[in-house]
Amino acid sequence: SIGKLGIEEKNKTRRGTLGLDLESLRTIRNYFKKINRLPTDVEIETLAQTWSEHCKHKIFSGKIDNIKEGIFKKYIKGATTKIIKKRKDKFCVSLFTDNAGGIEFNKDWLVCHKVETHNTPSALDPFGGSITGIVGVNRDCLGFGKGAKPIANTYAYYLAFADKDYKLFRQKNNQDPMLPANYIANGVISGVRVGGNCSGIPTPQGTIYFDDRFAGKPLVFCGTVGLIPRKIKGKLSHKKKANPGDSI
């Protein structure tokens, strides 16, 4: 019940779902048995957040019948690695290891780019889903290497037609209706605008595509481009490590 209902408080109320399946809960239990102590509530909720499908992509990276290594390792990471090996110019300096990917812009600068989707959050709360999407990738450029400067945002929205009245529901018996298409469109667009432009990062590029198939869930891509000097104080800027005593 802890996976569905969350941690129980002293007054017997629950904090809300952790979204952890039985296998994940057993893994957490076995680890803390091994180190001979109980987990704190913060540790449990941290694991629930970082192991979520939204953050960890357990389904996307999981093994499937005819692709044992999973879709991500075979078709994204694997394909990228093959292409890079064939090229003579080794311009990719950081891939699949940091908060964003980084390539050489010229001999003095690196450019980094991070794009992520915020589909389900935007279906439930269009403004909140898209603003957390864009500021999240702003953060990822800031977190690249020793800290890149975000210089531009990008977006791609795949939405249902805003002038149509779709009758869709999340639950059986016409319970929990989907938000109206025009409400989703306005909220998604406003979220990226406020998250980027109002913090001083321009949004010069984007695309919008409309189709009935996105009435159940919009596709909301948010992206940020950043710049960072090739070297900082004589050291490669994409190289970093955490040291004891560092501030967070």
Language-model features: locations:
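Core nucleic-acid recognition elements
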Residues: 1-248
